[in-house]
Swiss-Prot record:
Tissue and organ expression note: Isoform 1 is present in the ovary and the testis, isoform 2 is found in the larval and pupal tissues, while isoform 3 is found only in some pupal tissues.
Origin organism lineage: Eukaryota, Metazoa, Ecdysozoa, Arthropoda, Hexapoda
Gene that encodes the chain: GATA-B
UniProt GO cellular component terms: nucleus
InterPro entries, per database record: Transcription_factor_GATA, Znf_GATA, Znf_NHR/GATA
Tree of life domain: Eukaryota
Keyword tags: Activator, DNA-binding, Metal-binding, Nucleus, Repeat, Transcription, Transcription regulation, Zinc, Zinc-finger
Main location: nucleus
Molecular-function GO term, any one: RNA polymerase II cis-regulatory region sequence-specific DNA binding
GO biological process, one term: cell fate commitment
Disordered: annotated segments: 50-122, 178-197, 364-389, 436-460, 487-508
Protein name: Transcription factor BCFI
Chain positions of all zinc fingers (GATA-type): 269-293, 322-346
Key word Transferase present: no
Length: 508
């Protein structure tokens, strides 16, 4: 204690002298002592503290007791002095070495099937799985920014790899420049930068082909992630190209449809030669067939026949001439009853009328016409157009009621050579029958009338009458509802006092 006090006094004098600019060992005067005439006042003020200087800074005599608070204050101490209590040094802190928890595995509760008790282990496994699943769902539910897309895929893949255990990471080396194929099976024990991916040999073959293609383009480290939708995505970071350079672009996601179109490019149907089809088939020998040829071959057991245009058949028979009209140009060559070659016009005429076609009907060019729909009438169309032009408003009302009308019942009979046939009529077409195919009535048209309806159908009111009646009923109901309201208004007007009218005397 004495040595400490002596050292403290010495250091205090040394620091004070150094701060005042004096050499060590020489203390500077106080500001009060430096002023002229203030030295006496300073010494007078410091007299009450002289005993402190003696007790604190003077070395004590050997065998004397250490100074106390009472002696420092100038009060003689008569009470028994206590021995100061020694403080024990603090005990050193003890830190246990941190040991990471053991890796999660399912081996500790396989004895459940053997009849052992493992409820605690099973509950811990369930809790860990629920926690990992919640973490995955939380990562999926967060809003994704374009810059953090790859980071999110990496985090999800790491969580899935931690969840799936008992498997192994399978690494394959792709062909080409030897870039590693980052394919991992489900159940990798340690986290890896490659996500959990394809689990079949087909996906591995597809990956190798795609990796070779992109390796030729200078981009490596591609992987297939079947858990993320079966798409092909680039590896994390930029892949290395041949020569140690870095690829300057990152590939975007490629859809499975685009991948399928890429791998089916270059196929051709061996039957019809088609190169585009929604689905490719194979025949018995393994050759590719388009969808139409493949279905025909599967249903009929033979290749689908190819139809050739009929107009090209005349060019394949040069020198052929019609025996009736001596023409050499026709869309289709026919044979008559005697087996002679005739043109298309003469053959059809003889087939319809059983007589040869007269030469006066011969045309210099082939007459082509548009096929008209069945049961069509030109006059009906013309009359409808004339009515629309004459009265547009009436035509609009007519179209409105035609749309509101229910479709007619099935059934009116049409005469034909085969018998009676049931057909559904159209609204804007007249009922026209098919002529009998007799020799004398080939060109005659027979018009049939619609079948008679039952009395219940004929007595049914028309839509016009129904609308008129409904409108009248609504009007009557509206009037009945409005009458009490008008009576109330009239009564209120009668009960209200008359309004006061100002006269010229009120302003005086």
């Amino acid at each position: 204690m004495d040595a400490t006090m002596q050292t403290t006094k010495h250091e205090y004098q040394f620091e004070g002298a150094a701060e005042c600019g004096y050499p060590p060992g020489r203390t500077g005067l106080s500001p009060a002592a430096q002023l002229p005439g203030a030295a006496a006042a300073h010494s007078l003020d410091m007299q009450p503290y002289s005993h402190l200087d003696d007790s604190l800074f003077k070395p004590p005599t050997p065998g004397s007791a250490p100074p106390t608070a009472s002696t420092c204050a100038g009060v003689p101490s008569s009470a028994p002095r206590r021995r100061p209590r020694r403080l024990r040094p603090p005990a050193p802190l003890h830190y246990d070495d941190y040991a990471p928890p053991p890796p999660y595995s399912h081996d500790h509760h396989h004895h459940l099937e053997q009849g052992g008790g493992g409820n605690g282990a099973a509950s811990r496994c369930t809790a860990v799985r629920l926690q990992q699943r919640r973490a995955i769902l939380h990562q999926r539910s967060r809003p994704l920014r374009p810059a953090a897309a790859l980071d999110r895929v990496r985090r999800v893949s790491e969580l899935r790899q931690q969840r799936d255990t008992g498997g192994r990471i399978r690494r394959e080396r792709a062909e080409g420049w030897g870039s590693p194929c980052r394919l991992s099976t489900r159940g990798s024990a340690a986290p890896s930068p490659a996500p959990a991916g394809a689990r079949s040999a087909v996906a591995g073959r597809i990956f190798r082909v795609v990796n070779d293609i992109y390796a030729a383009m200078g981009i490596h480290n591609m992987f297939i992630d079947a858990d993320l939708g079966g798409v092909i995505t680039p590896g994390f970071g930029l892949g290395k190209v041949k020569g140690g350079r870095q690829a300057g672009v990152e590939l975007t996601f490629m859809r499975t449809v685009e991948l399928a179109e890429f791998f089916t490019e270059g196929r051709e149907c061996v039957n019809c030669g088609a190169i585009h089809t929604p689905l490719w088939h194979r025949d018995g020998t393994g050759h590719y067939l388009c969808n139409a040829c493949g279905l025909y071959n599967k249903m009929n057991g033979m290749n689908r026949p190819l139809k050739q245009p009929r107009r090209l058949m005349a060019a394949k028979r040069p020198g052929t001439m019609c025996t009736n009209c001596q023409t050499t140009a026709t869309s289709l060559w026919r044979r008559n009853v005697q087996g002679e070659t005739v043109c298309n016009a003469c053959g059809l005429y003889f087939k319809l009328h059983n007589v040869n076609r007269p030469l006066t009907m011969k045309k210099d060019s082939i007459q082509t016409r548009k096929r008209k729909p069945k049961n069509s009438n030109i006059k009906a169309d013309r009359s409808a157009k004339a009515v629309q032009r004459a009265s547009p408003r009436a035509s609009r009302w007519r179209a409105y009621w035609m749309r509101r009308r229910s479709p007619p019942r099935l059934g009116y009979y049409v005469q034909s050579a085969e018998g009676m046939k049931l057909e559904e009529p159209q609204h804007h077409v007249m009922y026209i029958g098919v002529p009998e195919l007799g020799p004398d009535t080939r060109t005659r048209r027979t018009t049939t009338t619609p079948p008679c309806r039952s009395p219940a159908e004929t007595s049914r009111p028309t839509p016009n009458i129904i609308i008129i009646i409904s409108t009248f009923v609504v009007y009557i109901c509206t009037c009945v509802i409005e009458l009490p309201r008008s009576d109330r208004r009239r009564r209120r007007r009668r009960r209200s006092p008359p309004k006061y009218t100002f006269t010229r005397h009120d302003y005086i």
